[in-house]
Amino acid sequence: MSKESSFDIVSKVELAEVNNAIQTALKEIENRFDFKGSKSSISLEKEELVLVSDDDFKLSQVKDILLGKLVKRDVPIKNLDYGKIEPAAGGTVRQRAKLVQGIDKDNAKKINSIIKDTGLKVKTQIQDDQIRVTGKSKDELQQIINAIRKADLPLEVQFINYR
């Protein structure tokens, strides 16, 4: 049995789920008593979330509400890269959060070193924003998946195309 097995390591955020989480968070913000009359909003511009509120405290509450809704929808919150809080129009404050899609070179190298540290005989290929892992044994590939899941990576990864 010389047929090789493989899988791909990717880091993706489902934009439809992010949109659903934003809608439910906005409903909660509309209905909460402490947000009555506030200018709080959440919007999705391309692959960037924009959070706006009256002040820093309300902005942090909006962020907490959104994070709760994202977690309920299984959206990886590790893949949010927050910018700094900046003043916006009308005395409000704004914060942008970039949705990280794909694995950048630095994280690909980290994942590659985790795979090498296992000492298993597998091959890795970095392909744009994903990593392909190929090996003869499916058991070895399962061990690689477990090692990567246990590692503390700065972004959430998914394993697809397992053959």
UniProtKB/Swiss-Prot annotation:
Belongs to the YajQ family. GO terms for molecular function: nucleotide binding. This is Nucleotide-binding protein BBR47_25280. The keyword Nucleotide-binding applies. GO terms for cellular component: cytosol. The lineage of its organism: Bacteria, Bacillati, Bacillota, Bacilli, Bacillales. It comes from the Bacteria. InterPro entries: DUF520 (IPR007551), UPF0234-like_C (IPR035571), UPF0234_N (IPR035570), YajQ-like_sf (IPR036183). NCBIfam families: PRK05412.1.
